[in-house]
Amino acid sequence: MLYIAQTTISLAAVFGIFQLFRIRNRAAFLITLFQIISIAISILTGPPVEKYGFYLFDTLILVATIYIISQSIMLRLKIQLLLISVPVFLSMSFKLFQWPYSYEWSILMIIPVLTYITVLFQRKEMKHELGIVTIITTEAAIELLSVFANWFNS
């Protein structure tokens, strides 16, 4: 499961690299760039350093949430983007800080995945956020698949 997760998030990072060439907003560009860097740190380094990649990725999800709130986009799209970023941020925070109920937050990753499917139909309205949201949703899908894998293995 680990190699599947690493491959999947790496593909999302490659998609983010392609999105970097289309982004004209500096904040969205930097968020996407640092998400790609945090994924590289998490995958390419060993146990003492990879933890910092996860912390950076979680912090960038919070920054992306603030960025989404501050953007002047349609309210419906803003709510959908927040439905993607906020649960993933909370789930990763619960896991990283080893708080209780982190497994329950992983079950709620169905919300970002389903919301992302609806957002894809409105991708013309999202000029700069598609790379950010794709990487965040990929993380949510990996968490959701790990929950399903645990259910089927037990």
Predicted segments, located by residue:
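Membrane-interface helix caps and helix-loop-helix hairpins in membrane proteins
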Residues: 44-51, 93-102, 152-153
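Membrane-interfacial loop-to-transmembrane alpha-helix junctions, especially the N-terminal start
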Residues: 21-34, 73-84, 104-105, 126-136
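Juxtamembrane boundary at the C-terminal end of a transmembrane helix
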Residues: 144-154
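Alpha-helical transmembrane segments and their membrane-interface exit regions
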Residues: 15-16, 37-38, 59-69, 109-120
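Alpha-helical transmembrane-segment detector that highlights a single hydrophobic TM helix
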Residues: 47-76
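Hydrophobic alpha-helical membrane segments
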Residues: 83-90, 104-121, 138
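Hydrophobic alpha-helical transmembrane segments of multi-pass membrane proteins
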Residues: 6, 30-45
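Hydrophobic transmembrane alpha-helical segments in integral membrane proteins
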Residues: 1-12, 49, 53-54, 150-151
